[in-house]
Amino acid sequence: MLRNGVQRLYSNIARTDNFKLSSLANGLKVATSNTPGHFSALGLYIDAGSRFEGRNLKGCTHILDRLAFKSTEHVEGRAMAETLELLGGNYQCTSSRENLMYQASVFNQDVGKMLQLMSETVRFPKITEQELQEQKLSAEYEIDEVWMKPELVLPELLHTAAYSGETLGSPLICPRELIPSISKYYLLDYRNKFYTPENTVAAFVGVPHEKALELTEKYLGDWQSTHPPITKKVAQYTGGESCIPPAPVFGNLPELFHIQIGFEGLPIDHPDIYALATLQTLLGGGGSFSAGGPGKGMYSRLYTHVLNQYYFVENCVAFNHSYSDSGIFGISLSCIPQAAPQAVEVIAQQMYNTFANKDLRLTEDEVSRAKNQLKSSLLMNLESKLVELEDMGRQVLMHGRKIPVNEMISKIEDLKPDDISRVAEMIFTGNVNNAGNGKGRATVVMQGDRGSFGDVENVLKAYGLGNSSSSKNDSPKKKGWF
């Protein structure tokens, strides 16, 4: 019965995929999905981000996304804020390593007005000295907050170590020591290089394609580039190690040590990306305490083999960061300080078991369960217009097209346990072959007493993890962003 339900849902998806894509004369792409409803979602997606920041532009992405929807050459800051409130206040600008996203959700009749404000903030920001200083102070506070939360700071350290502080290793959050040097001059230089129509996608959900084209032509059709195209540096994975002091303890919370071990993963457009996503779901994981009650992810490997077996583990979860030409895949673990010497071996065992332990090989049942969980997560997320919008905008920015949902579901359905094991072995033995020709070394970041974690490299080597042929003499240079 459930199987029939899945098949019917699959058929409905195929019939309702009404994606359309056009380009304006200036190179700007317009993507639409005319999903019916009383609300529409729209966004502008810029092919920029922290990975493209040169030495003089470090931190500009972070500050620029905080300066969104402020005063412009044609709209004062107060008028901008008041108009946005009247339109519902559901707007945001977020930055990542590979793009900046200006997004909003409004009533259908307000799409034109919101696009006008978006085009103002993207094309004509005033960037007053007062606004800049306010956002610098806000950034300092934000940095302090990040350093108080291991789940936020460790992924940053992971990227910095994995790529030696360059390209994908450039800090997503502006380093504190660079905040004073961020000026309007550098921000405008960054915008001049990356904010161009050829680097931009205008995406709409719930708006007819012809109307979207008309509005985009009206507000963005006369936008012209003033800078030649930028040659973008390929991300080169190097691997590495980093350790920071223990996090402060508040109230009655326990003191914990944290460790993340990762290897170079796959680019987002790699044919095996669906197998890797399924592997992440299969490993799963979570915390020893679940605020929503028991049951979520109980059958994932990191729950059954780690959280249910080792009392000293507070949190254990698989992570996957995928980008246009590289990625990082691994496992994160938090434990009591006394158990830090066992942490590396616990992680190494779980990685090894996915491809080399014949007694714990991946079964048809657990792979099927992971595939169903991945499909349901994908489909439920896409029920939100804002999620559908972001998915469409980022796909067009990266691939030049939107991959149909039924195509993604079909590729997940076709996976076999051997596919998952093959990809796991490729990742965990350091044999990924990406454009940057990265080394197959592990990336290890820790928060706690470094000596307590022991000889991480030898433990990983004992389990056959990582490519140990890399010489110790070509250790990556340390960058002081953190």
UniProtKB/Swiss-Prot annotation:
Localization in the cell: Mitochondrion matrix
A Pfam family annotated for this UniProt entry: Peptidase_M16_C
Any one GO BP annotation for this protein: protein processing involved in protein targeting to mitochondrion
UniProt xrefs under Gene3D superfamilies: Metalloenzyme, LuxS/M16 peptidase-like (3.30.830.10)
Note: Present with 31400 molecules/cell in log phase SD medium.
Function description: Substrate recognition and binding subunit of the essential mitochondrial processing protease (MPP), which cleaves the mitochondrial sequence off newly imported precursors proteins.
Family named by the database record: Belongs to the peptidase M16 family.
Protein name per the record: Mitochondrial-processing peptidase subunit alpha
Source organism per UniProt: Saccharomyces cerevisiae (strain ATCC 204508 / S288c)
Lineage per the UniProt record: Eukaryota, Fungi, Dikarya, Ascomycota, Saccharomycotina
